[in-house]
Regions:
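Transmembrane alpha-helices and adjacent helix-loop boundaries
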Residues: 1-195
Length: 195
């Protein structure tokens, strides 16, 4: 998602066009359709077989990449243009300005939406059940087929998903706090009584 996100902020109309085409095509189609296309459609067109877990990983990765590209673009464009001008005026190239001035500031702003996207991607893995990937939802279905205890099994599956998403959220929140150290506003000093 970083490469198309950077391409979408590029001065090159060609790079921007490719990035926009990718982002809009992926965001404009449901993930389930992308999974089915990668597992059933593409292999027919190419005359090859793609294992279900490989197709699933590619589908989730490509889908996530489109959303991450927009997160990257938004974070970069949220940085004041004066930052770029300041970097350029000190003699930095466009790439150096992006790497040393814009990117560190933009990355801090990306953490909350990236956390959200990471959690969404984890939950989206449940859609891979349609192509036979043996993930958590599939395992739940198989257990229910044996013991017919749907309530307990689906409750357990939900608890597992909740535990995973809360863990991811906690880890990324920790890193967000680490990156924000030294970025908090300094409290105003008390006014001088002698003035």
């Amino acid at each position: 998602g970083v490469v198309p996100g950077l391409a979408n902020t590029s001065r090159s109309r060609f790079l921007r066009g490719i990035a926009i085409l990718y982002i809009e095509a992926i965001r404009g189609t449901p993930l389930i359709v992308q999974v089915m296309f990668l597992y059933f459609g593409l292999p027919l067109a190419l005359g090859m077989r793609i294992p279900p877990d490989v197709a699933g990983v590619i589908a989730i990765g490509v889908n996530s990449g489109a959303y991450i590209a927009e997160i990257v673009r938004g974070a970069i464009q949220s940085i004041d243009k004066g930052q770029t001008e300041a970097g350029r005026s000190t003699g930095l190239t466009q790439a150096q300005t992006m790497l040393y001035i814009i990117w560190p500031q933009a990355f801090r702003r990306m953490i909350p939406p990236l956390t959200n996207q990471c959690i969404i991607s984890l939950k989206d893995t449940s859609l891979l059940v349609v192509i036979g990937v043996g993930e958590l939802t599939r395992q739940g279905q198989e257990i229910i087929a044996v013991n017919f205890r749907a309530f307990e099994v689906w409750l357990t599956v939900a608890i597992f998903y909740l535990a995973m998403t809360l863990s991811i959220s906690a880890v990324l929140r920790y890193y967000e706090r680490k990156l924000m150290i030294g970025r908090r506003a300094v409290p105003a000093s008390p006014s001088d009584p002698q003035m």
